[in-house]
């Protein structure tokens, strides 16, 4: 009897598993997004929805949405012309509620938002894809006495770093903008993919890329849910605390723990928006540290000490002062002021004026453009 019950139980389990497999087999196979013949089709299975819409970052305004049509098995669908080659983000609105594409595993985090990703292949986006020879990306913790907390940064090491035990590398300190953190450049910016491709093609020198958290009160990205510092960094007494920490704590940490070349000619600094401000501040406060200076989408205030600080940069010497900004960017007037200050003080520089505004569309392009110019 006991054996019979055991056999019946086993048979029941087999039937249950088969039933589950059948249920899985009968589920609707939704493919989204699907790029074909110059068009992109987006699909979402939403059984009880009455209105489903699509919003994509390639659309002109945040209020613009494209209605989707309900088809068989409650799969909503819309086909649109493929935007120009680039990386875009998108999401659906189901009865007014924003949701990501559940069938798309490619996701980017922008601050406190997760967004589905669309990569349209082409010349501009070629270096945003995975390379054949890939470097490593790691999260590294360090102690900051200046900021009073243990903090995290993201570090990229190029392909071959682990095996070339004696080779030393130059370092790019790559800074994010407001609302970002130490993961912004590796997620939204595709920094690792861009460097991997440029290095593999021989267009850029193999380099270490350090991406710190530019929010002085944060230990790390908010995804870790760690408490923030209670120090008021808006207090003038704490002015430039993060920039000072970058130069006096992060750089020594990197040069001690990585095979980094500890010389001015092997250090570059670049940043977007808030990070662009950190870039100019770091080079004006510490003019003898970096040979390559690349602020993006930011401005520079003209004040009584600016000329003296610019003259100090000129005296210390540098190899590249590269500025990138979109002509439709709200930071463009500030960029024009920066250029005027550099001209007034006789500092050679390059202005890369692109179209577009204050977006990753431009910042990825800028990294892809200036990285080959570093450490030459």
What are these language model-derived features?
Residues 21-22, 32-65, 69-376:
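Non-catalytic cap/lid and distal C-terminal segments of serine-dependent acyl enzymes
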Residues 10-18:
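Hydrophobic h-region of N-terminal signal peptides that target proteins for export
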Residues 25-27:
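Short, solvent-exposed loop/edge segments of extracellular or virion-exposed proteins
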Residues 2-8:
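Sec-dependent signal peptide recognition
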Residues 8-9, 157:
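A periodicity- and composition-biased signal for non-globular, repetitive helical segments
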């Amino acid at each position: 009897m006991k054996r019979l019950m055991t056999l019946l139980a086993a048979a029941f389990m087999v039937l249950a598993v088969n039933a589950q497999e059948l249920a899985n087999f009968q589920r609707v196979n939704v493919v989204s997004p699907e790029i074909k013949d110059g068009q992109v089709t987006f699909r979402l299975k939403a059984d009880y929805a009455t209105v489903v819409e699509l919003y994509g970052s390639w659309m002109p305004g945040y209020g613009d949405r494209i209605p989707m049509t309900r088809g068989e098995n409650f799969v909503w669908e819309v086909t649109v012309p493929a935007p120009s080659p680039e990386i875009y983000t998108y999401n659906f609105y189901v009865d007014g509620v924003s949701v990501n594409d559940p069938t798309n595993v490619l996701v980017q985090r922008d601050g406190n938002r997760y967004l589905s990703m669309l990569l349209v292949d082409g010349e501009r986006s070629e270096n945003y894809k995975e390379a054949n020879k890939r470097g490593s990306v790691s999260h590294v913790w360090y102690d900051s006495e200046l900021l009073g907390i243990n903090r995290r940064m993201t570090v990229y090491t190029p392909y071959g770093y682990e095996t070339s035990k004696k080779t030393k590398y130059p370092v790019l300190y790559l800074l994010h903008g407001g609302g970002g953190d130490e993961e912004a450049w590796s997620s939204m910016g595709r920094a690792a993919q861009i460097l991997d491709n440029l290095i593999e093609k021989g267009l850029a020198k193999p380099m270490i890329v350090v991406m710190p958290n530019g929010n002085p009160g944060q230990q790390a990205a908010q995804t870790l849910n760690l408490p923030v510092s209670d120090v008021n960094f808006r207090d003038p007494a704490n002015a430039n605390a993060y920039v000072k920490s970058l130069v006096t704590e992060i750089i020594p940490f990197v040069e001690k723990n990585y095979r980094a070349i500890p010389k001015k000619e092997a250090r570059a600094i670049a940043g977007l928006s808030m990070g662009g401000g950190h870039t100019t501040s770091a080079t004006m406060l510490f003019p003898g540290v970096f040979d390559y200076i690349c602020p993006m989408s930011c401005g520079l205030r003209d004040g009584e000490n600016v000329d003296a600080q610019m003259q100090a940069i000129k005296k210390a010497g540098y190899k590249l002062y590269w500025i990138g900004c979109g002509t439709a960017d709200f930071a463009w007037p500030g960029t024009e002021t920066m250029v005027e200050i550099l001209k007034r003080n006789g500092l050679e520089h390059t202005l890369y004026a692109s179209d577009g505004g204050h977006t990753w569309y431009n910042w990825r392009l800028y990294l892809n453009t200036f990285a080959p110019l570093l450490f030459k």
